[in-house]
């Protein structure tokens, strides 16, 4: 298991910085999982709205409070909340707070 940390600025049209710690490498994930990672979004930053094609994504919230856009609907997420964005659908997430937003992200490939 080789963990890899990636830093992104204004990812998918968002604002500020986010950090993705990939917990498993592709060889460990197999063909069904595209990404399993711990994601941190800096205070007052966001991951912009984007659509999924050929895969779906789930978030499990760990720390902080988020504004989550699920297609056309926005809602607040707190630790313990889970989301799922299906193939062909879109989402984005914003950290409006003064502390980092931390969540697990799992991207599952369609077969």
Question: What do these predicted regions represent?
Answer:
Residues 73-87:
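Short acidic-glycine-tyrosine-enriched beta hairpin
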């Amino acid at each position: 298991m080789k963990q890899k940390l990636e830093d992104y600025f204004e990812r998918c049209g968002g604002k500020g910085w986010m950090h993705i710690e990939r917990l498993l490498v592709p060889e460990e994930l197999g063909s069904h999982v595209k990404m399993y990672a711990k994601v941190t979004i800096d205070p007052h930053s966001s991951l912009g709205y984007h659509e999924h094609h050929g895969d779906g994504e789930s978030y499990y919230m760990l720390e902080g409070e988020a504004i989550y856009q699920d297609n056309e609907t926005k809602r607040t997420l707190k630790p313990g909340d889970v989301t799922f964005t299906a193939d062909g659908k879109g989402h984005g997430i914003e950290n409006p707070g003064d502390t980092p937003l931390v969540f697990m992200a799992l991207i599952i490939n369609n077969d």
